[in-house]
């Protein structure tokens, strides 16, 4: 592999930009819905995001799991796995996306009710969920192709695809929500069309014949599918848990502060989604590098990549917290169409507490990706399940009972801090194995 420092910056810079772009799908909807529909639209969007997170999580699990195995096989020159893995992953993606598509056509309303939509928000939530579920095959195939193209030596093309999808979403959001007056439906259509354009950009990889992965005739292999799921499980848990946490927070906040509290949380959660994407960008950027180094047994380079990744994570955490702390008022005001003082107060206070979580999030996300990339899916799964479910759910109920809405804002910072302890242990344990 070429100079490891140059490779790190090549992959990580492209992926941070790309992931920020990808995360702006929902942030753009948040902004335009806030301005064009109002607080009920924000609430409806926030209620819809958990099902989006689950769908997106499955796509990332298959994409990251399949691409990680593909990259490791490239590193150790296992040509049989290289030939088969993409086809297995694509078939699995189409299976799951078909289920979501059918649910979008037949069950959007009951799903909305299950997610907490009430009389004021049911129609808006149903409109949004129905449209993006129908477009699930494009969302999931886009995730799959982004991961494989990145691991096939084209991180810049993956970045361009993600940014194209994001910018087109912003433009179409504006056109469909305002000039066309489609409101919630327009925002959903803009988001749904974005992965289609992203896939068109990714097709350049095949048109130029730069691809080393192909479709081939194979028998479905349960063993290979389970291997993909194991290596990608941490990505699934991160996405699914964020959806479950959002659903749980929505319900708790509804009881504490009503719809206006959920709207305020929607602002916080969607800004947090963009900030989290920076750490996801670092982790997904180092994944192909670490996987190939692991396949070649280049353990010294893996240590160097980890040092760079953690340094970048800490620097970004400090900078992002300072920016959101100092400018919290104008940031919240941008999403508050009616200048509601209650929404302003709840969201600004929440940002100051909630965003301390980023001091620890990067370490935990990068560690989970490092463990998956070095063929330690069990440890990555343990770390992710503690972040996503084991600690955060009881912590949310306990802290909200003790401190009200401030307890909600404290839940993730405390959870991520606790998870950092086993994360450091797993890193040290794995690196010691490399020294043997």
Indicate where each model-derived feature is located.
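Short alpha-helical transmembrane segments in multi-pass integral membrane proteins
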Residues: 1-15, 70-135, 179-233, 290-357, ...
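N-terminal transmembrane alpha-helices
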Residues: 3-37, 50-65, 69, 94-101, ...
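Transmembrane helical elements of multi-pass membrane transporters/channels
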Residues: 10-29, 131, 142, 165, ...
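Helix-terminus/linker motif at the lipid-water interface of multi-pass membrane proteins
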Residues: 24-43, 112-119, 175-182, 243-270, ...
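Small-residue hotspots at the loop-to-helix junctions and early N-terminal turns
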Residues: 39-50, 125, 129, 188, ...
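Small-residue-rich hydrophobic transmembrane alpha-helices
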Residues: 42-102, 139-158, 264-328, 361-380
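Hydrophobic transmembrane alpha-helices of multi-pass small-molecule transporters
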Residues: 54-57, 169-173, 198-203, 273-277, ...
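Short runs within selected transmembrane alpha-helices of multi-pass transporters and secretion channels
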Residues: 63, 131-150, 158-169, 187-202, ...
